[in-house]
A protein has these predicted regions:
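Conserved acetyl-CoA-binding loop-helix of GNAT-fold acetyltransferases
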Residues: 84-102, 249, 255-268, 272, ...
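Conserved hydrophobic beta-strand within the GNAT/NAT acetyltransferase core sheet
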Residues: 112-116, 244, 278-282
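Conserved GNAT-fold acetyl-CoA-binding loop/helix
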Residues: 14-34, 185-206
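Short loop/turn motifs at secondary-structure junctions and domain boundaries
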Residues: 36-41, 208-215
Length: 315
């Protein structure tokens, strides 16, 4: 435990991650803005490693519920403790994570979540010896994928007679929310496994429904008697890039080719709108991952989620 002011944190973080930040074109001001955005107004607890004269490592715990903590903040620092490159990354990471375990146990938290980020590397290179040696278990791998639409050859699309395709605005937000809840509560995504109904509802709110209404590729699928079977939400990222924030199929109709049909129609509409790149995020163990890969999407980044539960913190 310890204290540190934001200016010291920014300077140290930029120093410790300078090659990485320079490669990404990230400057000191962006580091400051990023840390301020993630820290200000949030209940955070810092784990600090110091010598007598200077900061040599830090990590932060972010409470995400009354019983759950998340180690570190987000993509800016890649989900790992920030360590002075002159010191052993392995040793200091392990010390900081152990401090987090003890603090969590003393404050009655039941679960700690750790993230390990990777960019453009094989997952096998990114196993976290430190997390696993402290009793954490890998929960799932979430990946970001992208497809270069300039190289994509649109297939002939065959729409079954009983299926109709419409724009997102042709379904009510209430009906979309209800389908989202059913699809992911009953589906093969690990992320939603332990979420409460309220947390799933909040997640739907984060998907950008209102913005998706304006984009080509935000569509719905209806079946017999007009039953809502699936929908997609697409968001604008840059002038020539779009992002699939959500794509789901009713659980009764999964595995019947509707996901493939939806993706084909989405991509056709987006390409016709002059868009050059399409991105998305998914769990690597989901069936949808193989569908995306078969249509030219490739992994560009990812994160391994680790979890420690059940009062094991004070060992």
């Amino acid at each position: 435990m310890g204290t540190v002011d934001l200016s010291e944190l920014v300077a140290f973080t930029y120093y410790a991650r300078k090659p990485e930040f320079e490669a990404k074109g990230i400057g000191v001001r962006q580091v400051e803005d990023g840390l301020r955005e993630q820290i200000d107004g949030k209940s955070t607890v810092f784990m600090i490693a110091r010598t007598e004269t200077k900061l040599i490592g830090w990590m932060v715990l972010l409470p995400v519920s009354q019983t759950k903590l998340q180690i570190n903040l987000d993509y800016l620092i890649d989900g790992r403790p920030v360590i002075d490159p002159a010191y052993s990354q392995h040793v200091l990471e392990k010390q900081l994570i152990q401090m987090a375990r003890v603090w969590a146990g003393e404050n009655d938290y039941q679960e700690i979540i750790g993230k390990l980020m990777f960019h453009g590397r094989a997952l096998a290179e990114d196993k976290s010896e430190n997390y696993e040696s402290l009793g954490f278990r890998p929960e799932f791998v979430y990946v970001g994928m992208e497809c270069d639409l300039m190289d994509f050859e649109s297939p002939d699309i065959v729409i079954p007679e009983e299926i109709s395709i419409g724009e997102l605005e042709q379904a009510s937000e209430r009906d979309l929310r209800a389908l989202f809840f059913e699809a992911f509560r009953c589906g093969d995504t690990a992320f939603f496994r332990d979420l409460t109904d309220a947390e799933i509802d909040d997640y739907f709110d984060s998907l950008g429904y209102q913005d998706a209404l304006e984009q080509k590729g935000s569509i719905i699928l209806r079946g017999e008697a007009g039953r809502l079977l699936g929908f997609s939400m697409v968001l604008a990222f840059e002038e020539t890039t779009r992002h699939i924030s959500c794509m789901c199929i009713h659980p009764e109709f999964q595995g019947k080719g509707l996901g493939k049909l939806m993706l084909q129609v989405m991509m056709q509409k987006i390409i016709a709108d002059g868009i050059e790149k399409l991105t998305l995020g998914t769990e690597q163990a989901m069936r949808a991952y193989q569908l995306y890969a078969s249509y030219g999407f490739r992994v560009t980044w990812g994160e391994v989620m680790y979890s420690l539960t059940g009062g094991k913190y004070k060992s």
